[in-house]
C-alpha cells in the first residue's frame, strides 16, 4: 500500500539516520578475528606496509569486513564528540577498484571525522585522509579530500571556537 514505507514516529526517523558498520565488521585487535582468511591477512599486511602499528589499529578502531563490497578493504570508523559512530570509509587495498574509498551514506559536510579526539581550544591539524591522520600527533582530523567547504560542520566549528589550524595537505592538493 502506498503509505506503508512512511515513518510512523520520530524514533523511526532516528533509527533510519543511524549509521551502522557492515554486519560482519571486526576490529583487527579482536582476538576472535579470522586471521585464517587470506583477504583479512592481506588487509593486515597492507596496513603493516603502510606503517600502521597495533596501537594505531587499536586507537583508530581499524577493522575489516568480508561482505557487502568491503572485502579487501580496511575500514576506518569515525566517532562524533559523544562517541557515536558518525561515518566510516573502506579503503581498497589493491588500488585497482573503483571507488578507492567506499563511504557510509552520510553527507561528509555534516560530520567531523573522529571529533571524539578533537580539542577545539588547541591547534588542530587538518590532513586529507585517514592514513594521513594516523601519522599526526594529537588533535587532528581529516578532510576526506583536499577541500574544506565553508558550509561544512568542520569549518563552522573551527570558526565558532576560533581554533588555530595547521594544514598538512598532500603536494597535489
How would you label these PLM feature ranges?
Residues 1-55, 59-64, 68-73, 84-85, ...:
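Non-catalytic accessory segments of DNA primases and related replication-initiation nucleases
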Residues 148-149, 169-173:
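Acidic, metal-coordinating catalytic cores used for nucleic-acid/nucleotide bond scission
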Residues 67-163:
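Phosphate-handling DNA/RNA-contact segment within nucleic-acid enzymes
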Amino acid at each position: 500500500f502506498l503509505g506503508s514505507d512512511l515513518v510512523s514516529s520520530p524514533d523511526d526517523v532516528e533509527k533510519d539516520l543511524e549509521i551502522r558498520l557492515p554486519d560482519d565488521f571486526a576490529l583487527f585487535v579482536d582476538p576472535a578475528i579470522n586471521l585464517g582468511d587470506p583477504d583479512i591477512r592481506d588487509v593486515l599486511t597492507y596496513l603493516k606496509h603502510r606503517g600502521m602499528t597495533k596501537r594505531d589499529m587499536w586507537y583508530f578502531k581499524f577493522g575489516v569486513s568480508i561482505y557487502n563490497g568491503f572485502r579487501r578493504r580496511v575500514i576506518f570508523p569515525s566517532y562524533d564528540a559523544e562517541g557515536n559512530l558518525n561515518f566510516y570509509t573502506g579503503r581498497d587495498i589493491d588500488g585497482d577498484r573503483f571507488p578507492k574509498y567506499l563511504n557510509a551514506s552520510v553527507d561528509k559536510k555534516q560530520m567531523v571525522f573522529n571529533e571524539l579526539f578533537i580539542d577545539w581550544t588547541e591547534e588542530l591539524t587538518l590532513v586529507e585522509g585517514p592514513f594521513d591522520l594516523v601519522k599526526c600527533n594529537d588533535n587532528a582530523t581529516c578532510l576526506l579530500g583536499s577541500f574544506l567547504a565553508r558550509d561544512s560542520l568542520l569549518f563552522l566549528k573551527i570558526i565558532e571556537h576560533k581554533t588555530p589550524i595547521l594544514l598538512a595537505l598532500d603536494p597535489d592538493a
